[in-house]
UniProtKB/Swiss-Prot annotation:
Listed transmembrane segments: none
SUPFAM superfamilies found in the cross-reference section: Ribosomal protein L13
Primary gene name: rpl13
Stated name of the protein: Large ribosomal subunit protein uL13
Family: Belongs to the universal ribosomal protein uL13 family.
Molecular function, one GO term: mRNA binding
Role, per record: This protein is one of the early assembly proteins of the 50S ribosomal subunit, although it is not seen to bind rRNA by itself. It is important during the early stages of 50S assembly.
Entries under InterPro entries matching the protein: Ribosomal_uL13 (IPR005822), Ribosomal_uL13_bac-type (IPR005823), Ribosomal_uL13_euk/arc (IPR005755), Ribosomal_uL13_sf (IPR036899)
GO CC field: cytosolic large ribosomal subunit
BP GO terms, sorted: negative regulation of translation; translation
Self-association state and partner proteins as the record states: Part of the 50S ribosomal subunit.
Keywords for the protein's UniProt record, in alphabetical order: Ribonucleoprotein, Ribosomal protein
Length: 136
């Protein structure tokens, strides 16, 4: 089982990395999902996510999440082949937590160097995005 800290990691890169690990049969736990970042213009990102929310309605989808852990989980799921059993089972092996839960030991947590933000000017965390969407 891999425990990955999502603090200061790029949202899309982390999702792609985790999706690959899940398809290889690993169990993955992601902690601190609210501290993952999306790079780009803040206003553009917020408008893009709000536009997605406006597409669906209460009775008819698509349904887009508003909380940080569900936003990250949805992006991982979008990178998996959901129509076949292999993809569904892979997504079931993924657990995403907003913060560090008590049942996860902090000694085994690893940071993935390939997906870290270095010197990026425009970023927004999933927590800030969630507040803008009304999820927190």
């Amino acid at each position: 089982m891999k425990i990955i800290d999502a603090s200061n990691t790029v949202y899309g890169r982390l999702s792609a990395y985790v999706a690959k690990q899940l398809l290889n049969g690993e169990e993955v736990v992601i902690v601190n999902a609210s501290k993952a970042v999306i790079t780009g213009d803040r206003k553009f990102i917020i408008d893009k996510f709000k536009q997605r929310l406006d597409i669906g309605s209460v009775r008819k989808g698509p349904y887009y999440p508003k909380t940080p852990e569900n936003i990250l989980r949805r992006s991982i799921g979008d990178m998996l082949p959901k129509k076949i059993t292999r993809g569904k089972e892979a997504l079931s092996r993924c657990k995403v937590y907003r913060n560090l839960p008590k049942n996860v030991s902090s000694e085994k947590i690893e940071k993935v160097d390939d997906v870290m933000t270095d010197k990026v000017v425009g970023i927004i965390t999933l927590e800030e995005l969630s507040k803008e969407l009304g999820g927190m």
